[in-house]
Amino acid sequence: MSDAAFDSVSVNPPANGAGSGDDFSVPVPRPKTSIFKLVGEVLDHGGPGYLQFAITNICNADCGFCGFARSQFDPKKRRSVTLQEAKDVIDIAVRNHIGYLLFVGGEPLVHRDLRAMVRYAARKGIKPMICTNGGLWTEENMKALASDGLSSVIMSIDAHDIAAHEKNRGLKDVCAKIRRANEFFLSLGVQTTASITASKLIEDYDKLPAFLESLGFENCTFSYPLTDLKSSYLSFSEGGLVSFTKDELYEVFEKIKRMKHRSGYPVVNPTESLDEMQRHLRGETEQFGCLGGFKYFYLDWHLNLYRCHFWETPMCNVYEWDESKLVRDGCTRCMIDCYRDPSVLQFVAVSVMDTWKALKQGQFLRAARHVFDRRNLTSIKAVAEDFKWVTKV
């Protein structure tokens, strides 16, 4: 499918909101959470959860390390959720204490109802976020989504120069679109983040900060390379770009840490999480079990809910999702950054919840164990490290 064909189905609903029951001319404010509400959420359920919602498996890009690539994906398997399904998901997510909803794909901007989904989430008090390759940005859809309550944008970056990035993505002039998107969203206070796949396309990590700044990014996060996923999610590849030996991958994490500390450029991945992934590679005991299935979730275009991208079997269909389905078993099977990194950051909030519940049950020794767990300090340090980014999401 050509870029022109994708443009025809990108975010462009009728101006009057026909067919969605919404008036798109009326702006929706970005959701905000008061400190008092946040404290209550932490005590009650460990703080707001996070849902990655793959609203489509269609993508306009042709990345060399992704199963969603347009040249690899079977057109007969294309599937997108309906607007009504998305609204149902958002209602269910609210009941399950989700505070952040990240729309992913495929490429979420190909979905014609993305605006309506973002608006509905924002009205329900969930912070809507978009993860995109940036190839379908237009002045029209940027302005539209900003007025729909969009909270944050994540855009993919693969290399430290334009030619290498655009060649891998198969998207001509995408860097110019990304630069313009950063300029536009930052002018409105909508946070943008570069999501960098740690692949062999990156020849020199020290060149990344200047390149990111040239595109208008003020921070970045690294996606750890994935060569196999057990769920329906296809953002992985067995190919050479993301295929590393354990020793090579260990050194990749060293390079990320060195870049982070030498340059001072804001890297969202907590240092402790990078250390944790190195412990994982060495087969050492890991300090922070993953909160996937308890605070973080992946939902696919079939509405099957997984604890993360890696897991083989769904927890349940989204319509069956309730507290009884939650899993908290300290899993350390994988190295997926969007579950492992926040598990370090949110550890202290979940510890506060555990302490509070133990106190209410009169279990004072158990409460004390949670309070004096050394990992609380490590988690607090990670939050302090990412404080500016966390408060803007």
For every predicted segment, state its role.
Residues 3, 48-52, 218, 228, ...:
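Accessory C-terminal segments flanking Radical SAM cores
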Residues 1-45, 304, 313-316, 324-393:
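Radical SAM enzyme core and accessory elements
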